[in-house]
Amino acid sequence: KNMITGAAQMDGAILVVSAADGPMPQTREHILLAKQVGVPNIVVFLNKQDQVDDEELLELVELEVRELLGQYGFPGDNIPFVAGSALRALENITQNNTIQRGENEWVDKIHSLMDAVDEYIPTPVRDVEKTFLMAVEDVFSITGRGTVTTGRIERGIIKVGDTIEIVGLRETTTTTITGLEMFQKTLDEGMAGDNIGILLRGVQKKDIERGMVLAQPGTITPHTQFEAEVYVLTK
């Protein structure tokens, strides 16, 4: 469930596969889910390269993953692959956090991975001109501050002090944004594409939940009947 919720918001993804073990059952599941929720681009990282002595084995794993990607509609032949070891890179950075590119082969492989992401996954065009809208993904309370809701802003721009509506499931209510945070940094504004935490004035945790949306007042109307296309997953 968490993988689907997160993947549905992605502009691209890094598929991590063990170079030592090859594709696992969850590898197939993640590729399928990525396709079904509309992840447009994937870059593959073959992890644990330090455990593979045979270059042919590494090539075989890459071939397997490319075929698997092709089976689910991704361009397997064109997707970038980067091999490395996240553990070895982390160990070296932990020992020397000022390490620069070109000074360690394992750290360089992570740089190469991010190069592949930058080159293969295009920077998306954000819809910042339209009115603010964000689906609620999670809600939690911060002692002494209030209720925070998290999610990905679908469109528009939001600022501290703005008035918004909480729409869906219950009576529509109005509140004021008293704080914005992203990746533990306080912001003055958030915009389309940001995964953000929004601190709401006078709202209790019990009053808001996943399935509701935050929106500019008067722009979203809740409905009890609608048409939808549903993809059902079994356990």
UniProtKB/Swiss-Prot annotation:
SUPFAM superfamilies: P-loop containing nucleoside triphosphate hydrolases (SSF52540), Translation proteins (SSF50447). Residues 1-125 form the tr-type G domain. Its EC number is 3.6.5.3. Keywords: Chloroplast, Elongation factor, GTP-binding, Hydrolase, Nucleotide-binding, Plastid, Protein biosynthesis. It comes from Gracilariopsis lemaneiformis. GTP hydrolase that promotes the GTP-dependent binding of aminoacyl-tRNA to the A-site of ribosomes during protein biosynthesis. This is Elongation factor Tu, chloroplastic. One of its GO terms (molecular function) is GTP binding. Gene3D superfamilies: P-loop containing nucleotide triphosphate hydrolases (3.40.50.300), Translation factors (2.40.30.10). The keyword Protein biosynthesis applies. GTP binds at N47, K48, Q49, D50. It comes from the Eukaryota. InterPro entries: EF-Tu_GTPase, EFTu-like_2, EFTU_2, P-loop_NTPase, T_Tr_GTP-bd_dom, Transl_B-barrel_sf.
